[in-house]
Amino acid sequence: MGDSNDRIVIGLCTFNRHEPLKEALDSLAQIDIPEGTEVEFILVDNDKNEGAKYIFDAYIHDMPFKCYYFMEKNRGLAHVRNRVIEEALKLRATAIAMFDDDEIVAREWLVELYKVFKESGSDGVAGTVYRLLPMNSSDLVKKLWPNSKEPANISVKLLPTNNCLFSTNLVDPKGRNIRFDNAFNFSGREDLVFSFDALFQGAKFRSAPQAIVIEKFSKERSTFKYLLKRWFGTGITDAMVARHYSFGMGKRTLKEILSIAWRCLILPFLLLGGTRPPAAAILYITASLGWLCGLFGKKTNYYFKHID
């Protein structure tokens, strides 16, 4: 591993989340560098007013590697992630690592990602996300956002952009030449579609459970109102993905209709004191309704206000 001379570019995308970004950059400045690699860092700001530039300027002197700032004027998740790819290719990167601007990376984060990446010979690796929930979070929130690790170095189907590293062969024009799909700019799931496109071309992904990032949840994201909106949007986006690939439409639609019918049937009993919390049933109904809306063309712009 020490003689590989891989060049890793860490890409971070941000939009109007200044305080979390400061914590993210502070943690990044303290990471260990994998032996035998060159590491560089790219921050892509989706704010046309370059609102994150002053934060970048304040932290670059603490970084143990070269840093670059870019403003991407085209709004959306796919646009900023593709900008990371384009700039990383210009830097002749052999691998790209990504995490989110509301996350804190562990000191050994990059070392662990790279270790599994090299040992497995895979095209990409996915790390572990620990969610730091607000104090007094409900049991429902804790159940919906569990902290768990995948077993070491197993095959996975998703390369989540909140904690991953992948070979530039996936994105190089001379390789698989995959990009994030602009159709999912504001809906999310752009990393799921990216992963599917890579898998369809024969790519292999592995888990790197010791590569840890910590995501801080705000109080707003722990409210039932937020969860309703998020689950409805997720249902819509799942339908968008299914329509994009035209697979599993009929079977999934039948499943969602039956899910709505069943949960509407049992909901009155839950409200009267059943053993299961009615909130969970309401969320599942909401997600199923989102799927049906997405099936008929409705879209969600959940990520218009920020980049996750």
Describe the role of every protein-language-model region:
Residues 72-90:
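Glycine-rich, basic loop-to-helix element that forms the pyrophosphate-binding segment
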Residues 108-138:
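Conserved donor NDP-sugar-binding/catalytic core segment of glycosyltransferases
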Residues 92-104:
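Short beta-strand-to-loop acidic/aromatic patch adjacent to the donor-nucleotide binding site
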